Amino acid sequence: MATINELQDEVVEEFQDFTDWMDKYQMLIDLGNELAPLDEKYKNEQNLIDGCQSRVWLQCDYVDGKLVFTADSDALVVKGIIALLIRVLSGHTPTEIMDADLYFVEKIGLKDHLSPTRSNGLLAMIKQIRMYALAYKTKEAEA
């Protein structure tokens, strides 16, 4: 499996093909549409991310020492953003996720082109992913 940085570099390369931000938004929507559906049983208050204007559910499973994320949102652009985060971070260890510098967010211009509420939502999604990583890293240390 590719490293987090290799996956980030792939994302940056794909987004460099577009100079117009409308095309980048369309790519986010397409990525959201391609995101595997989240089982309805996971669309609950426990998996709802606080701090997002849209509703975003994030499910985390611990499989063979790695975190596997699935998610959904009721907003297409937000669904695309969480799809990017899942693509880069899912399948990695809690330590790798905790130590990751998510530079792709800035390199593709995401921070600069999101509304303040969507930027806050992006930060909330990253924070929730890192919280899962911290929780599982703590469980590993206790085992």
Model-derived features: where do they sit?
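Hydrophobic (often cysteine-bearing) scaffold residues that line and stabilize catalytic clefts
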Residues: V78
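N-terminal intrinsically disordered, cationic/polar leader segments
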Residues: I4-R55, Y62-K66, V105-E142
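A short interface-forming secondary-structure element
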Residues: S73-A75
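Alpha-helical support elements that line or immediately flank enzyme active sites
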Residues: I82-H92
